[in-house]
Every structure is written in structure tokens, then in C-alpha cells.
Curated annotation (Swiss-Prot):
Its cofactor is Ca(2+). The gene is Prss2. Ca(2+) binds at residues 75, 77, 80, 85. Residues 1-15 form the signal peptide. One of its GO terms (cellular component) is extracellular space. It catalyses: Preferential cleavage: Arg-|-Xaa, Lys-|-Xaa. This is Anionic trypsin-2. Binds 1 Ca(2+) ion per subunit. Disulfide bonds join 30-160, 48-64, 132-233, 139-206, 171-185, 196-220. Its EC number is 3.4.21.4. It is found in: Secreted, Extracellular space.
Length: 246
């Protein structure tokens, strides 16, 4: 689930209705297998997303950690066996050593699969960033998370949302004192379009590169509270070093 940071501490997320017909919130159903790097993390049920970065490694959010995870690839409808899926258990699950559960700084995790997956048109990797993308860059967010800003509707079909990277100043103004250099906001200050609970760990891909990981936010799709994402470009060395050592 995307972390409802701070609001969860008072017992419930306070979210106001924006449009109860929205997808992801405010997105659309992805074309089948158009996001072949998207994975579902499963522990008897879908609980988080992730991104395939090579044939044996997935990147997700550290707050999605569970001791046992099955990674499901090639999915579109996560409640129907469509024949294209690959289910692989996690062999190693490695949270960033400086992950802070309270602030969600360094909210990134690597999963080594027990065996390499077969890459094809439905299961493919996404590139790590060659550099940090500038504000205004258009990106694709995807996941099977809640599609309502008020209430719960968990979709069967993978949802997509096109959204821009926001200036860091806007991000910091939306969440005073909460944004670190390892976080980036993506979305719309006017609200109405956002990732939500269940999308956590999933990808933000800009120009073919994984620039963000769904991390946290106040509610979903609320005005002046855009989604906050782990800034993947800060972790390329850690990712590469961790893979090499494991």
C-alpha cells in the first residue's frame, strides 16, 4: 500500500471526493501488457507494485517489505490467470540500509528472484536513470492500487496515469519539513489525479527510465498534496553495488 504517512497515525486517512469514476485515481486502464516491467508483489494477495530492472532483480519501496514475497510478472488482470504470467518467489529481499520507517527517507528495496525470468513482449525490464529528470518531464505511473480518492475500489486491471515531475519547491511547499533530497513529487497540485494505496513500490517511468517509486502522500489526489516518490536517480550506485554483491 502507498503509505498514508502521518494521517495513518490519527486512525484513518481523511480524503475528500474528487471523482468517484476515476482510475488509479484519475487515470485510465493501461493497454494490456503495455507496461511489461510492472510487477505485482503477492503474499496471498496483491499488496504492492515493483519494477523489473534485469532478469533476476526487482526494485520496489522499502515500506513494502515482507519476509516472504512472490513476484508476479506479465500480469494485466491480477485476479485472472491469462496465460502470460510468471510467478517467481523472492530469494533475497534487501531494504536500503538507511531506510527510515518514520520519515520514509530512502524508501527503496531490491528483490532478488529465485530464478531468472523469461523476457518477452509481456515481461521486460526498465532502464535505470542515466541522470535525474528535470521538473516538467512527463512520466507514466502504473499500478493496481485504489482508484477512489474517497472510499475503496481495488481494480483487477492495471491502471495508468500520465503525470509530470513537479518542481522541488512545490513539493516542499506541499509538505513542509517532510521532503528530503531523496524524494520527488509527481502529479497535479490541483488534485484529482494520483497514485493511491496498493500502488506503493510501483514505477514512475519518464522517457523510458525509472525515475520514481510510489512511496507516500496525504490521502490520494487531494489539492496541494501530490504523490511523493523515491528519487531513483540518487540510488543507481547502491542498486548496482547491491546486485553485484548478491
Amino acid at each position: 500500500m502507498r503509505a498514508l504517512l502521518f494521517l495513518a497515525l490519527v486512525g484513518a486517512a481523511v480524503a475528500f471526493p474528487v471523482d468517484d469514476d476515476d482510475k488509479i485515481v484519475g487515470g485510465y486502464t493501461c493497454q494490456e501488457n503495455s507496461v511489461p516491467y510492472q510487477v505485482s508483489l503477492n503474499s496471498g494477495y496483491h499488496f504492492c507494485g515493483g519494477s523489473l530492472i534485469n532478469d533476476q532483480w526487482v526494485v520496489s519501496a522499502a515500506h513494502c517489505y515482507k519476509s516472504r514475497i512472490q513476484v508476479r510478472l506479465g500480469e494485466h488482470n491480477i485476479n485472472v490467470l491469462e496465460g502470460n504470467e510468471q510467478f517467481v518467489n523472492a530469494a533475497k529481499i534487501i531494504k536500503h540500509p538507511n531506510f527510515d520507517r518514520k520519515t520514509l527517507n530512502n524508501d527503496i528495496m531490491l528483490i532478488k528472484l529465485s530464478s531468472p525470468v523469461k523476457l518477452n513482449a509481456r515481461v521486460a525490464t526498465v532502464a535505470l536513470p542515466s541522470s535525474c529528470a528535470p521538473a516538467g518531464t512527463q512520466c507514466l505511473i502504473s499500478g493496481w492500487g485504489n482508484t477512489l480518492s474517497s472510499g475503496v475500489n481495488e481494480p483487477d486491471l492495471l491502471q495508468c496515469l500520465d503525470a509530470p515531475l513537479l518542481p522541488q519547491a512545490d513539493c516542499e511547499a506541499s509538505y513542509p519539513g517532510k521532503i528530503t533530497d531523496n524524494m520527488v513529487c509527481v502529479g497535479f497540485l490541483e488534485g484529482g489525479k494520483d497514485s493511491c494505496q496498493g500502488d506503493s513500490g510501483g514505477p514512475v517511468v519518464c522517457n523510458g527510465e525509472l525515475q520514481g517509486i510510489v512511496s507516500w502522500g496525504y490521502g490520494c489526489a487531494l489539492p496541494d498534496n501530490p504523490g511523493v516518490y523515491t528519487k531513483v536517480c540518487n540510488y543507481v550506485d547502491w542498486i548496482q553495488d547491491t546486485i553485484a554483491a548478491n
